[in-house]
């Protein structure tokens, strides 16, 4: 017995069998790599990943989990999502692009697996948080399994495998790390402030880009980060709407639309810090961010960013009024907002048609007509495809299956709804948005039931951002900001668990 392990001698025949099996597998791998080459590198490397997982699983149990390293890695991951261009990467043949985001995500997943493997306390805390609403994590697991299964019927298996692994790393790092960290007191508020700071950094880069006419790093990228890809070249060159010729700011994002989405998703957090009783300097900084963010959205020339701001403001007003009414029973203003809310929605909707500038920002003008028409055509083209195969065509295949090309002759798909339906079918669509809708429901319920709990107030911007996300994804297919959504889902689940746990403790 050494170090908690017991030495065991295996029969000679078993050892010979295992050595022979290893040699045969090595010969097979060598033959496959020699005949197919680097495109098969991802598949050939799968057993190595399995060995790492088995090694982590075999670690002796004990309370020595490296959970302290999760926080710096996590916030580096949060910052990289907004501040590092995801198209600047090291490219090795047969492997996905080695970006900063994927590298940090992989390290997070590795540390997280070690913590889960060795620490019973760590597992217990995560299990308690996930148990706050099992429907959500079950939807997430089912959605991941569906993604994995779709590789089997995908017409381009290698590309789909790359997409699956990259997606699982980003989602796993974002969701499960957040499940653990957001149980800490005050962590949700700290995350929200950090989120606003990093998005503000992306906005400042966007303002700089607007002065230069292209992203600041165009022409100044180190050789080891340069990717010989026409899409990347187009991003670095910058873009403009064909009807106006005016440069559209994109900052670190791959498109102006993704930047506008990111700023729109952050709006509820800025509104939160302006609205509640935070120190004056924080409220002023949040107000300044609102002005800057709105200005950068205008520079992106993206309607979806304005829509996200509008949706966030309207739904935040409702949740704020509910909390005020629940806290101050004698209030007149708060219940007046709640009861008149249907009228507020109707007025807001009608104003998008009657007010000229508002109509242009929401529904577009002549300059955006081509984009509007393209989205209509895509839905018309997609419906027969969805009817032919309601189970989807495989991860990462939606654009090819749809077959739509924009005016420049480039394949395009403009709705994440379509992407889900074409990739994973009706089931995938239901699992993904069912998970988000359920999170919104339990978050709103906690706000209503425990309005005075500081953490339940903090859940409001997370819930509102998820509502805005559902609206925005109807007109944007890219998943550039997907990691933030998984963080928000986990944040809501963790806050719900904390508030309910505190309520039980108070009753006891």
Q: Can you name each region flagged by the protein language model?
A:
Residues 50-53, 310-314, 461-473, 477-508:
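Transmembrane alpha-helices of multi-pass inner-membrane enzymes
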Residues 34, 201-217, 300, 317-366, ...:
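A membrane-periplasm/extracellular boundary helix in multi-pass inner-membrane enzymes
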Residues 73-78, 284-294, 444-475:
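Loop-to-helix entry and N-terminal half of a specific, functionally important transmembrane alpha helix
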Residues 247, 251-257, 294-298, 302-303, ...:
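A conserved mid-to-late transmembrane alpha helix and its immediate loop/hinge
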Residues 278, 310, 314, 318, ...:
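Hydrophobic transmembrane alpha-helices and their immediate junctions
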Residues 353-424, 443-450:
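Long extracytoplasmic/lumenal interhelical loops at the membrane interface
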Residues 140-152, 173, 190-322, 445:
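Alpha-helical transmembrane segments of multi-pass inner-membrane proteins
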Residues 18-29, 65-172, 469-472:
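N-terminal hydrophobic segments of proteins, predominantly signal-anchor/transmembrane helices
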């Amino acid at each position: 017995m050494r170090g908690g392990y017991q030495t065991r001698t295996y029969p000679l025949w078993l050892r010979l069998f295992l050595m022979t099996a290893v040699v045969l597998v090595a010969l097979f791998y060598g033959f496959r790599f020699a005949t197919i080459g680097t495109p098969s590198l991802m598949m050939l490397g799968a057993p190595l990943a399995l060995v790492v997982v088995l090694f982590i699983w075999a670690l002796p149990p004990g309370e020595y989990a490296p959970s302290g390293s999760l926080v710096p890695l996590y916030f580096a991951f949060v910052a990289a999502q907004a501040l590092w261009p995801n198209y600047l990467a090291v490219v090795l043949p047969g492997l996905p692009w080695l970006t900063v985001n994927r590298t940090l995500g992989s390290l997070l997943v590795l540390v997280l697996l070690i913590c889960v493997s060795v620490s019973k306390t760590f597992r217990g805390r995560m299990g308690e948080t996930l148990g706050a609403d099992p429907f959500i994590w079950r939807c997430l697991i089912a959605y991941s399994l569906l993604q994995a299964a779709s590789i089997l019927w995908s017409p381009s298996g290698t590309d789909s495998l790359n997409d699956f692994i990259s997606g699982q790393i980003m989602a796993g790092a974002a969701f499960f790390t957040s499940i653990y960290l957001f149980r800490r007191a005050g962590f949700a508020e700290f995350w929200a402030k950090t989120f606003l700071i990093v998005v503000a950094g992306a906005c400042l880069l966007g303002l700089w880009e607007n002065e230069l006419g292209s992203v600041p790093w165009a022409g100044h990228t180190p050789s080891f980060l340069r990717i010989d890809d026409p899409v990347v070249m187009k991003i670095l060159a910058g873009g403009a709407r064909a009807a106006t010729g005016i440069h559209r700011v994109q900052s670190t994002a791959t498109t102006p639309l993704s930047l506008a989405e990111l700023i729109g998703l952050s709006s509820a957090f800025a509104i939160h810090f302006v609205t509640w009783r935070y120190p004056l300097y924080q409220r002023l900084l949040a107000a300044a961010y609102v002005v800057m963010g709105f200005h950068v959205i205008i520079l992106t020339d993206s309607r979806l960013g304005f829509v996200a701001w509008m949706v966030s403001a309207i739904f935040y007003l409702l949740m704020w009024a509910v909390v005020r009414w629940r806290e101050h029973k004698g209030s007149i203003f708060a219940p007046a907002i709640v009861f008149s809310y249907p009228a507020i929605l109707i007025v807001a909707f009608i104003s998008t048609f009657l007010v000229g500038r508002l109509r242009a920002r929401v529904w577009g003008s002549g300059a955006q007509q081509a984009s509007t028409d393209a989205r209509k055509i895509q839905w018309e083209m997609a419906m027969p495809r969805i009817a032919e195969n309601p189970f989807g065509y495989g991860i990462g295949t939606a654009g090819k299956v749809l077959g739509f090309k924009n005016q420049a002759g480039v394949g395009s798909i403009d709705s994440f709804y379509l992407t889900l339906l074409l990739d994973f079918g009706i089931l995938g669509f239901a699992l993904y948005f069912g998970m988000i809708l359920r999170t919104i429901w339990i978050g709103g319920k906690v706000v209503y039931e425990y309005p005075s709990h500081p953490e339940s107030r903090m859940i409001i911007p997370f819930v509102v951002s998820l509502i805005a996300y559902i609206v925005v994804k109807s007109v944007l297919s890219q998943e550039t900001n997907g990691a933030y959504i998984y963080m928000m889902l986990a944040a809501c689940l963790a806050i719900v668990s904390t508030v309910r746990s505190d309520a039980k403790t108070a009753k006891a």
